[in-house]
C-alpha cells in the first residue's frame, strides 16, 4: 500500500502536504492554470499556489463556481469559466487568455469526474472520457502558444489506469461507451488516456525546455461514508484513515510536479507520493499513445463542429 511505502529519495512521501512541498519555493511572477479549481484537490492547489505568490488562473465549470474560489486565493487570482465537456466553453476560455496575452508557466489538468453509475454521453462520447481526457487535450493544445520556454504541464492521472482500465488498454472502437459500459473501467480508461496524453506530449516537446508529466494524487478522503450505519461507519472510517489521503496530502504531488526545482527539465514521467513510479504496460505503450493522440484530434475536430462522434 502507498501509505506504508518508504519515504522517497527526495525525502517526500505519502504524508507530505502541498504546503510542505512548496515551503522553500517562491512562485512570485509565476502564472499557473488549474482546472477543476473550485473544490477538492483543485481548491487546495489554488490555495497553496496563491500562498506562495503565484498568479493562479482558476477554471471551473461555471463562472459562479470559479468566483467562489476568491476567498482562499491571493489578489492576483483570475477566475475563468471552462466546461471541459463543451468545446465552445473551452474555446471561449482559451481565447480570453490569448487576447489578454497571458504567459503561462504551468498548467495543472486537475478536473475530472468519476465512475458515473449510468452511461452518460455528450457529442456521442462517453462523458468521463470526454471530460477527463478530450477536454484537457483541447485546452492544452489551444494554450500551447502561451506557454513560457520552461513551462510545465501536469496531467492528473490515477492508479486507476492500472486497476480499472480495460485489459486491452484504450478501446478505440468504443469511445461512445455503448459496448458493455462499466463505470469503473470507463474511468480507468480516461485515466490511462491522461497518462498516455502526458507521455506523447512529452515526446512532442522533446528538444524544448517545456515538460509534461502525469501524477497519481492518491485515494482522497471524502464524505462518502456519511450515509453508513454507525457500526459500519466506524469501521470504514478506521480503514479510510489508514489508506486514504486528505486533500492537503493529495494536492502535494501535482504541485511538486508543477513547481519543484528538483525536477526542472524532467519530462515524460509518472509521479506518486512526489516520487517517480512505474506505470502499467499500457501506460508505457508509445504506439497506443500516438494512436490516442490521432483519435483525440479527430474527436476534437468533430465535436468542435457540433457534430456527434461515431465509433469507428
Model-derived regions: residue spans:
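C-terminal tail/cap regions
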Residues: 1-15, 20, 232-233, 262-312
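Rossmann-fold NAD(P)H-dependent dehydrogenase/reductase core
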Residues: 3-228, 302-311
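A generic structural signal for short
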Residues: 33-34, 242, 281
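Intrinsic disorder
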Residues: 60, 84, 244, 283-286
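Polar helix-capping/helix-linker motif
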Residues: 86, 174, 260, 282-285
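C-terminal helical subdomain
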Residues: 90, 190, 214, 237-278, ...
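A short C-terminal helix-loop "cap" of Rossmann-like NAD(P)-dependent dehydrogenase/epimerase domains
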Residues: 175-178, 231-240
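Generic recognition of well-ordered alpha-helical segments
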Residues: 200, 253-256, 295
Amino acid at each position: 500500500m502507498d501509505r506504508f511505502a518508504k519515504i522517497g529519495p527526495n525525502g517526500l512521501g505519502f504524508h507530505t502536504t502541498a504546503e510542505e512541498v512548496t515551503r522553500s519555493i517562491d512562485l512570485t511572477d509565476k502564472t499557473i492554470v488549474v482546472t477543476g479549481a473550485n473544490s477538492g484537490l483543485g481548491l487546495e492547489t489554488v490555495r497553496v499556489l496563491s500562498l506562495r505568490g503565484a498568479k493562479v488562473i482558476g477554471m471551473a465549470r461555471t463562472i459562479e463556481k470559479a468566483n467562489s474560489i476568491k476567498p482562499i486565493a491571493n489578489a492576483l487570482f483570475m477566475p475563468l469559466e471552462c466546461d471541459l465537456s463543451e468545446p465552445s466553453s473551452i474555446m471561449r476560455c482559451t481565447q480570453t487568455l490569448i487576447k489578454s496575452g497571458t504567459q503561462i508557466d504551468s498548467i495543472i489538468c486537475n478536473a475530472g469526474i468519476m465512475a458515473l453509475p449510468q452511461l452518460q454521453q455528450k457529442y456521442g462520447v462517453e462523458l468521463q472520457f470526454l471530460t477527463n481526457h478530450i477536454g484537457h487535450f483541447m485546452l492544452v493544445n489551444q494554450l500551447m502558444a502561451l506557454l513560457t520556454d520552461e513551462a510545465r504541464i501536469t496531467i492528473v492521472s490515477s492508479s486507476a489506469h492500472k486497476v480499472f482500465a480495460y485489459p486491452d488498454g484504450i478501446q478505440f472502437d468504443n469511445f461512445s461507451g455503448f459496448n458493455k459500459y462499466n463505470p469503473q473501467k470507463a474511468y480507468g480508461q480516461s485515466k490511462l488516456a491522461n497518462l498516455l496524453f502526458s507521455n506523447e506530449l512529452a515526446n512532442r516537446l522533446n528538444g524544448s525546455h517545456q515538460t509534461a508529466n502525469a501524477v497519481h494524487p492518491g485515494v482522497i478522503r471524502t464524505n462518502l461514508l456519511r450515509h453508513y450505519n454507525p457500526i459500519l461507519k466506524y469501521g470504514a472510517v478506521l480503514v479510510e484513515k489508514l489508506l486514504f489521503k486528505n486533500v492537503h496530502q493529495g494536492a502535494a504531488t501535482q504541485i511538486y510536479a508543477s513547481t519543484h526545482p528538483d525536477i526542472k527539465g524532467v519530462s515524460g514521467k509518472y509521479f506518486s507520493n512526489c516520487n517517480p513510479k512505474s506505470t502499467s504496460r499500457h501506460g508505457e505503450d508509445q504506439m497506443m499513445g500516438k494512436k490516442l493522440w490521432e483519435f483525440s484530434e479527430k474527436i476534437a475536430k468533430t465535436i468542435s463542429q457540433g457534430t456527434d462522434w461515431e465509433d469507428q
